[in-house]
């Protein structure tokens, strides 16, 4: 294959995947600094930024950590960096962004003060505040704590992932270091009290750090910090575990237990630890000193999701939030619109756009299919389900009514594994057939097939979408869901489910583009048509909206199209490894990223000519 980028450093046109993701997360962080966004929504964006960063370190840095051990010389195909180089670049980038997060938190605290809400600084307390804090520590916190001494007689404890600790260096009689560690995950992250019509927020970590000396009696503290551990969460399942005689659900349960004890990939401190403490912890936790990151603001920012409800339980402060937006029900099948779902779909395709539309029409369709005598089976691929899922309940109801219900449930949906294990049990007990996908691929498709027998002929209702079958996230993500009785779509969906039941991937389709065999070749084919259109004097146009772009073959094809004169517009929310507007290569490529109230999640491809 002719090289598309022969005479230019690849780093000028391609971006490292991990650093591109960090730029995306920086865009999330920037929303928390936007004064036009309501206060509590800004706090939520800041919490999302830190939550994203936690997951990034657990998964992506965790994966690079593994690669640095197993394949230390493997290079990134876009920038030529090995795993160790990428980790160094990530840590440097994290340190560069940290002051921006600090500024965002300070701006939110300032606005909270303007709203008569104070984040207490324990170094500057009034006498009354001091009395309240002292009482809270003595009566509410101290009885629940279990301080631990770490020395030659007391072994180093296991430090759980994403949990914070007070770590203190205690005065020692010899040169050996003596530590005091106080776990406090069992305590609430903050305490709120009222004084003189002002609300005061007190962070548990700050209180414990302030009173640390009281926890260790006569042993004098030489230095003290809040510390937080991040562990690798990039578990992989060996394909041998899919053997016929293996209980894959049980294997995944054991893998989740293993995840909790994987290697440490990040150590966060509230202040700079001394050299002796750093060296001791790095040795015990087997991490490099460059994995120590400092943050003067709260290390665990998960409190930001719950704090708005604690401060305003009835949402009386309308100015603190985005205006309320309720999903619209375009067709209320349950109330007889269109003569019911199945009747309506005989004459109309239905395109739902979330979060603007409700998931109700799809749930109504499943419930109606459960009771319709013409329906033979319901087959569906499930990735992430909501708690108390109406969709799962509808599938269980259909099985209980005697329908054949096949659920392809992906147990490896990251951080939803346990939820999916629980749903697998529930669906099986209702009578559904549950299979767990393929050894080499995650089943990420959002596909549902309802098969009917009408006048001795097989007819299909097919739903294909970009979003999970999850009523909760459908109100937070922009997604598309297309429902049709198109026979070709139904036949393709049948092939997909038949292949999955055989442990295979579908290798040919007529209407649906199904990865890994049918999707990328079709994208390449249609871009090639636009290239040929331009070369024959016509105008070529490509529009792509996706979550991420990092596939080298597609990026090189887009560069080739740009060089041919094809106008290319892309909306890419997250990772984007292609630089637009590089002279001679991507001149005709324009890329935007949308970050806002809703998480952009729909995928759209438009090929205009050719």
Enumerate the predicted regions with their spans.
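Cofactor-pocket helix-loop regions in the catalytic cores of large enzyme subunits
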Residues: 547
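N-terminal localization/anchoring segments of enzymes in phospholipid and broader phosphate metabolism
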Residues: 1-542, 560-564, 574-600, 604-610
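Hydrophobic alpha/beta core scaffold segments
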Residues: 567-571
């Amino acid at each position: 294959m002719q090289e598309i980028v022969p005479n230019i450093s690849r780093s000028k046109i391609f971006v490292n995947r991990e650093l591109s993701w960090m730029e995306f997360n920086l865009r999330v962080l920037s929303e928390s600094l936007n004064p036009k966004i309501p206060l509590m929504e800004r706090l939520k964006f800041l919490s999302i930024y830190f939550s994203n960063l936690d997951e990034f370190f657990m998964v992506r840095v965790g994966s690079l950590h593994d690669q640095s051990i197993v394949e230390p010389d493997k290079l990134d195909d876009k920038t030529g960096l090995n795993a160790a180089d990428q980790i160094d670049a990530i840590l440097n980038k994290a340190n560069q962004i940290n002051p921006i997060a600090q500024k965002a938190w300070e701006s939110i605290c300032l606005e909270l003060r303007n709203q008569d809400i104070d984040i207490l600084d324990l170094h500057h307390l009034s006498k009354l505040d001091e009395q309240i804090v002292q009482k809270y520590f003595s009566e509410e916190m101290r009885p629940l704590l279990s301080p631990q001494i770490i020395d030659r007689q007391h072994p180093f404890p296991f430090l759980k992932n994403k949990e914070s600790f007070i770590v203190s260096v205690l005065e020692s009689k010899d040169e050996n270091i003596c530590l005091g560690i106080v776990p406090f995950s069992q305590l609430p992250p903050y305490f709120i009290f009222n004084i003189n019509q002002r609300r005061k927020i007190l962070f548990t970590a700050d209180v414990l750090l302030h009173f640390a000396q009281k926890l260790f009696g006569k042993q004098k503290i030489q230095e003290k910090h809040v510390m937080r551990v991040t562990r690798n969460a990039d578990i992989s399942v060996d394909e041998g575990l899919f053997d016929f005689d293996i209980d894959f659900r049980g294997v995944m349960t054991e893998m989740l237990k293993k995840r909790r004890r994987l290697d440490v990939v990040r150590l966060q401190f509230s202040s700079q630890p001394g050299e002796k403490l750093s060296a001791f912890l790095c040795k015990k936790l087997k991490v490099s000193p460059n994995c120590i990151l400092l943050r003067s603001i709260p290390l665990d920012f998960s409190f930001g999701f719950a704090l708005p409800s604690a401060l305003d339980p009835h949402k009386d402060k309308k100015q603190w939030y985005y205006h309320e937006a309720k999903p619209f029900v375009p067709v209320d099948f349950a109330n007889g619109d269109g003569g019911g779902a199945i009747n309506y779909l005989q004459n109309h395709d239905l395109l739902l756009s979330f979060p603007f539309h409700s998931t109700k029409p799809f749930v109504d369709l499943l419930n109606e299919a459960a009771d319709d005598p013409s329906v033979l089976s319901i087959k569906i691929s499930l990735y992430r389900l909501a708690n108390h899922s109406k969709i799962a309940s509808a599938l269980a109801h259909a099985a209980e009514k005697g329908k054949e219900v096949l659920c392809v449930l992906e147990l490896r949906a990251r951080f939803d594994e346990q939820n999916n294990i629980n749903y697998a049990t529930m669906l099986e007990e209702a009578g559904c057939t549950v299979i767990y996908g393929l050894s080499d691929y995650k089943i990420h498709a959002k596909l549902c097939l309802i098969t009917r027998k009408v006048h001795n002929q097989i007819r299909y209702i097919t739903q294909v979408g970009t979003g999970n079958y999850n009523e909760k996230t459908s109100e937070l993500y922009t997604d598309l869901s297309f429902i049709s009785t198109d026979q070709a779509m139904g036949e393709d969906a049948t092939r997909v489910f038949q292949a999955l039941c055989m442990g295979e991937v579908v290798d040919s389709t007529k209407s649906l583009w199904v990865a890994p065999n049918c999707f990328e070749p079709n994208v390449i084919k249609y871009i090639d048509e636009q290239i040929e259109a331009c070369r024959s004097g016509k105008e070529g146009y490509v529009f792509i909206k996706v979550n991420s772009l990092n596939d080298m073959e597609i990026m090189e094809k887009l560069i080739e199209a740009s060089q041919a004169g094809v106008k290319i517009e892309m909306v890419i929310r997250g990772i984007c490894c292609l630089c637009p507007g590089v002279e001679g290569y991507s001149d005709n490529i324009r890329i935007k990223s949308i970050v806002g109230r809703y998480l952009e999640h729909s995928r759209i491809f438009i090929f205009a000519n050719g």
